[in-house]
């Protein structure tokens, strides 16, 4: 048993639950939907990494293994991404989320080539992903304020379905990588492994690019593409604006939300990359990626007023004066 295989998951789990408690406290004060959904995602993070800690110390039972896979592979990225969509519910970000979910469905179908007997699961995942994507895109076009609710309805239904599938699936094969003793999904049937892709793609991409979009909103902008081009203008204008943002940072004039949201984006990307590598047999970085990613997100959220206006442990320990919220900036 590797020392780091116990310490890193324990650190990730403890930090996740502390983080979730702080976000829940903020939700109690402000009653913003994105905070509640993010807190759910962080609890899922804590349960998944807690299962890794228990598996590393007590041994991997089928129950611990199922908890790890359900929360880690399906629910963590999905709920954190859904929280981001709630934060950006006054924008047209639902189009991006819809495209990400549809792309995840296509990747599910493509992944069936790697897992024999998973073709039915791949086609089912693709069909459900396309229906969800169409519903979210339609809500974004017709009633923008409902886009996050539509996505959440599909996510809750999907959570119930995959929970039943994961908890009852027949397990065959190894739970751990033989060299690094890191958990791998090899014991689960192929149809479940391909079904996790839309949850990961939709949620993970929403969290990463939602944070980058939030950074773009607050940074000093250089528009090389007219704003009337809509979403097509965001990417080139974002990169064109980066030098000005760096200059403003050096001069101490940059809105603190810009580095905060970039930290969140990088923090979301790190475990996404290491989890993807885990799927392809590169397992040594898995626990480290989970921990470092969570630390970066935590630091980013701490300096982001959109989440933390004050920090309390029974009483207010630290606070700052309110300024324009992200929702008001994009509304």
Locations of regions flagged by a protein language model:
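Extracellular-loop-to-transmembrane junctions of the mid-late helices
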Residues: 4-12, 115-133, 137-216
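Membrane-helix boundary/juxtamembrane motif in polytopic membrane proteins
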Residues: 142-160, 192, 212-266
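Juxtamembrane loop-transmembrane helix junctions in multi-pass integral membrane proteins
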Residues: 2-6, 26-29, 33, 60-67, ...
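C-terminal ends of transmembrane alpha-helices
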Residues: 46-58, 108-121, 163-187, 268-280
């Amino acid at each position: 048993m590797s020392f780091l295989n116990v310490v890193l998951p324990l650190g990730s789990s403890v930090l996740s639950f502390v983080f979730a408690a702080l976000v829940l406290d903020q939700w109690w004060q402000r009653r913003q939907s994105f905070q509640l959904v993010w807190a759910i995602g962080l609890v899922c993070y804590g349960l998944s990494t807690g299962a890794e800690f228990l598996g590393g110390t007590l041994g991997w039972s089928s129950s611990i293994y199922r908890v790890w896979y359900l929360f880690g592979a399906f629910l963590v990225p999905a709920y954190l991404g859904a929280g981001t969509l709630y934060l950006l519910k006054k924008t047209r970000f639902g189009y991006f989320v819809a495209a990400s979910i549809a792309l995840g469905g296509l990747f599910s179908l493509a992944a069936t080539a790697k897992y024999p007997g998973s073709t039915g699961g791949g086609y089912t995942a693709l069909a459900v992903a396309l229906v969800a994507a169409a519903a979210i895109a339609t809500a974004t076009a017709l009633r923008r304020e409902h886009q996050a609710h539509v996505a959440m309805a599909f996510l809750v239904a999907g959570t119930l379905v995959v929970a039943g599938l994961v908890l009852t699936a027949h397990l065959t094969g190894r739970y751990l990588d033989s060299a690094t003793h890191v958990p791998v999904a090899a014991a689960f049937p192929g149809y479940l492994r391909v079904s996790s892709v839309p949850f990961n793609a939709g949620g993970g991409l929403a969290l990463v690019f939602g944070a980058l979009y939030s950074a773009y909103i607050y940074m000093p902008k250089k528009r090389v593409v007219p704003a009337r081009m809509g979403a097509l203008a965001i990417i080139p204008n974002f990169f064109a604006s980066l030098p000005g943002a760096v200059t403003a940072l050096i001069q101490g004039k940059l809105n603190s939300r810009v580095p905060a949201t970039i930290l969140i984006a990088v923090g979301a990307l790190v475990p996404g990359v290491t989890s993807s590598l885990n799927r392809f047999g590169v397992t040594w970085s898995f626990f480290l990626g989970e921990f470092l990613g969570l630390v970066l997100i935590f630091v980013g959220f701490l300096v982001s007023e959109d989440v933390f206006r004050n920090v309390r442990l029974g009483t207010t320990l630290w606070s700052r004066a309110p300024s324009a919220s992200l929702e008001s900036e994009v509304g």
